[in-house]
From Swiss-Prot:
Tissues where this protein is expressed: Expressed in pollen, cotyledons and lateral roots.
UniProt domain AIG1-type G: residue ranges: 11-214
Annotated region (G2), positions in chain: 46-50
UniProt keyword list: GTP-binding, Nucleotide-binding
Family per record: Belongs to the TRAFAC class TrmE-Era-EngA-EngB-Septin-like GTPase superfamily. AIG1/Toc34/Toc159-like paraseptin GTPase family. IAN subfamily.
Organism: Arabidopsis thaliana (Mouse-ear cress)
Name listed for the protein in its UniProt record: Immune-associated nucleotide-binding protein 5
Disulfide bond annotation, renumbered to this chain: none
Region (G4): 133-136
Stretch list, region G5: 172-174
Gene Ontology CC: endoplasmic reticulum; plasma membrane
């Protein structure tokens, strides 16, 4: 796959963009598609590379940074999406969502589809293919992709696969088997061709209405992020902390009052006991005095 001919500028090109969170193997997948190491791991900006496949197709692969990572700002995301589109003359022919069978589905993956639809428009699912990296992991376990998907497939993944018509493919980016390398690329390109046929040969973002839909998506995303930015971080947690602080303060005040009341009650009780004891002693003294006087009178008589 490394001895492919270089494409000419006049030949038709299929633009394939790789999206997904950082660490799922987008760059390695791009290298597998191109047939050589052209994309660096953990890229921080959109990169593109053209290549001619063994069957003569010209593909333009766009590797994107982790646009759906939770730490990515809206400004950065929009800038890179625009950058991505400038690298795709003729529109997008396929959007490949890259996931990994070696890691659990995280919040980034679950948020990816919503962000894709907001940024690229609702038509995105008509151009979507789900690509799973980590084929080497399943091979070691003697498992297939269907085996992996059947063992507790998350609802998010079921939804994505249903919306994109079940288009999926497994990649082993670590294999040295040339036959496997060619076969997995063929499988992905077969999905790309099916997408093209499904959409009547029309690519995404080739007409003004497509671009308008994308702009509307960008505006919605910006508005959503602006609203979120105005909210204090972890609002529920902060509110809970405030309530706990109030509750704790109230409890401490109540305890302090109880201690004070107890001490007062104890002091009052102690004082009452002393008065009672004093009264008892005085009464006993008076009684004894009366008895003593009575005895003296009896002796005189």
């Amino acid at each position: 796959m490394s001895d492919r001919a270089q494409p000419s500028a006049s030949e038709p090109v299929r633009n394939i963009v790789l999206v997904g969170p950082t660490g799922n193997g987008k760059s390695s997948t791009g290298n597998s598609l191109i047939g050589k190491e052209v994309f660096i791991l953990e890229t921080v900006e959109c990169k593109t590379c053209k290549a001619k496949t063994l069957d003569g197709q010209i593909i333009n692969v766009i590797d994107t940074p982790g646009l759906f990572d939770l730490s990515v700002s809206t400004d950065y995301m929009n800038k890179e999406i625009i950058n991505c589109l400038t690298l795709t003359d003729g529109g997008l022919h396929a959007v490949v969502l890259v996931l990994s069978v070696g890691t659990d589905i995280l919040k980034e993956e679950e948020a990816a589809l919503n962000k894709l639809q907001l940024l690229f428009g609702s038509k995105i699912v008509d151009y979507l293919v789900v690509l799973f990296t980590g084929g080497d992991v399943l091979e070691k376990e003697n498992k297939t992709l269907d085996d992996y998907l059947s063992r507790g497939c998350p609802e998010f993944l079921k939804t994505v696969l249903r919306l994109c018509g079940g288009r999926r493919v497994l990649f082993n980016n670590k294999t040295t088997d040339e036959v496997k390398k060619i076969e997995q690329v063929k499988q992905l390109l077969a999905h790309v061709e099916a997408i093209e046929n499904l959409n009547g040969g029309k690519a995404l973002f080739t007409e003004e209405n497509d671009l308008n839909e994308k702009r509307q998506g960008e505006m919605l995303m910006e508005q959503e992020m602006e609203v979120q930015s105005k909210k204090p971080e972890n609002t529920e947690v902060e509110e809970m902390k405030k309530q706990l602080e109030i509750s704790y303060g109230q409890q401490m005040n109540m305890m302090a009052q109880m201690v004070e009341d107890t001490l007062k009650e104890s002091s009052a009780s102690h004082e009452r006991m002393l008065l009672a004891l004093k009264d008892k002693v005085e009464r006993s003294y008076l009684e004894n005095e009366d008895m003593h006087n009575e005895t003296k009178r009896c002796n005189i008589l």
